[in-house]
From Swiss-Prot:
Complex and partners: Homodimer.
Reaction(s) catalysed (UniProt annotation): (S)-4-amino-5-oxopentanoate = 5-aminolevulinate
Domain of life of the native organism: Bacteria
Protein name according to UniProt: Glutamate-1-semialdehyde 2,1-aminomutase
Protein family (similarity comment): Belongs to the class-III pyridoxal-phosphate-dependent aminotransferase family. HemL subfamily.
Keywords: Cytoplasm, Isomerase, Porphyrin biosynthesis, Pyridoxal phosphate
Principal cellular location given in the protein's record: cytoplasm
GO BP term (any one): protoporphyrinogen IX biosynthetic process
Modified residues (N6-(pyridoxal phosphate)lysine): 266
EC number(s) given by UniProt: 5.4.3.8
Organism whose genome encodes this protein: Coxiella burnetii (strain CbuG_Q212)
Gene3D superfamilies: Aspartate Aminotransferase, domain 1, Type I PLP-dependent aspartate aminotransferase-like (Major domain)
Length: 435
């Protein structure tokens, strides 16, 4: 029963568009009643109807330590006692900035903001200001927040000017946004051949987390770095999702690629609203007040958020933190795949440390956006609701990644696998294929 959630959802729709403050939370992609959460602890969510869920959303990525981690809660509580916001510098800004740079050597200086969207938007403004160029390249299926210039859908043509994918975004705003095909270096090279003197930057997720989960091919990222070097453009890694999750040094450390700028978010706030962007010293020095490129924020560097973020990042230095997290992720994903194969369910998966994507398809490994969107969304909807009914909370969209935290143990993973095995064993015939 979800009586209280249903009542709250009905009430919320009177006061908020769609009843939510971020569209995916409304369950529009899967149908049904969104769960209103009243408490979270470790790997669990508890909704207002007192139902407990094993959580594989993790607030969409920030909760790498699990919910209500004692060290993070203590740090935030202590900070609150000294005031909620100063509008002036505080020492923890310096400490967090230094730790970010220690973890990610490509970030020689960093600017704190309030969200991943602010981080990518500001990084692009800085890239345009530094290069004196206006055009940017992004990739079909990659999501970099809701800034106007990044809300672009290129349709079937890779080598086209962007078209707005939301009303309210002026055509002129996105005409300088070029869209290429993820993991297709030729599509990027063709854009440089045509607009070589106009391209300020490439922005890319090294592991794309919003077309389910698709890792970049190593030679693809190497090629992007070489093209930027050749044409004098900047390479921006959007590591809002992957930063400090897939490795302490982010995805850039796994690929051994040094971007010019990096956008961060999610984990660096420990659950508080924080974003950041940083990179080469000479580029960051072009930001106001040192340089001419303007960016500011009333709540940037908020003392409570800085304390929570600093406490979170300190926990990531624990011995074997990432090897343990990767092992749990692999245990979960390989367990899901083996059960799908045994039940003849058409399912494939991609995963990295602490993050995974499941796609209902018989095509094999998914490496491009076009494959991801061809996954069977109806199969996912059925799977999602069966998991939810059995106490497992997945992202309510077939195109969103799942997250696992340090608080998940083999107990939660194995219980999840038992639930999946049971779901697959009794699934409708339409879910099955011949293998």
């Amino acid at each position: 029963m979800v009586d209280h959630s249903a009542a709250l959802f009905n009430k919320a729709q009177n006061y908020m568009p769609g009843g939510v403050n971020s569209p995916v939370r409304a369950f529009g992609a899967v149908g049904g009643v969104p769960r209103f959460i009243k408490k979270a602890s470790g790997p669990y969510l508890i909704d207002v109807d007192e139902k407990k869920y094993i959580d594989y959303v993790g607030s969409w990525g920030p909760m790498i330590l699990g919910h209500a981690h004692p060290a993070v809660i203590q740090a935030a509580q202590e900070a609150v006692q000294n005031g909620l916001s100063f509008g002036a510098p505080c020492e923890n800004e310096i400490k967090l900035a230094a730790l970010i740079g220690e973890f990610m050597p490509s970030i020689e200086k960093v600017r704190m903001v309030n969200s991943g969207t602010e981080a990518t938007m500001s990084a692009l403004r800085l890239a345009r200001g530094v290069t004196g160029r206006s055009k940017i390249i992004k990739f079909e299926g990659c999501y970099h927040g809701h800034a106007d210039c990044l809300l672009v859908n290129a349709g079937s043509g890779a080598l086209t000017f962007g078209m707005p994918s939301s009303p309210g975004v002026p055509l002129g705003t996105v005409q300088d946004t070029l869209t290429a095909t993820f993991n297709d270096l030729d599509s990027v090279a063709a854009l440089f051949e045509k607009y070589s003197k106009d391209i300020a930057a490439i922005i890319v997720e090294p592991i794309a987390g919003n077309m389910n989960l698709i890792p970049a091919a190593p030679d693809f990222l190497t090629g992007l770095r070489e093209l930027c070097n050749q044409y004098g453009s900047l390479l921006i890694f959007d590591e809002v999702i992957t930063g400090f999750r897939v490795a302490k040094g982010g995805a850039q450390s796994l690929y051994n690629i040094r971007p010019d700028l990096t956008a961060l978010g999610k984990i660096i706030g420990g659950g508080m609203p924080v974003g950041a962007y940083g990179g080469r010293r000479e580029i960051m020095n072009q930001l106001s007040p040192e340089g001419p490129v303007y960016q500011a924020g009333t709540l940037s560097g908020n003392p409570v958020a800085m304390a929570a973020g600093l406490a979170t990042l300190k926990e990531l230095t624990a011995e074997n933190f990432y090897s343990n997290l990767k092992e749990k992720t692999e245990r979960l994903v390989m367990g899901i795949l083996s059960r799908a194969k045994a039940a003849k369910i058409p399912l494939t998966a991609n995963f990295s440390c602490g993050i995974f994507g499941l796609i209902f398809t018989s095509e094999g490994r998914v490496t491009r956006y076009a494959q991801a969107v061809n996954g069977n969304v109806e199969h996912f909807r059925s799977f999602f609701h069966k998991m939810l009914d059995n106490g497992v909370y997945l992202a309510p969209s077939a195109f969103e990644s799942g997250f696992i935290s340090a608080a998940h143990t083999n107990k939660e993973v194995d219980k999840t696998l038992d639930i999946i095995e049971n779901i697959f064993s009794v699934s409708e015939t339409y879910l099955r294929i011949s293998v």
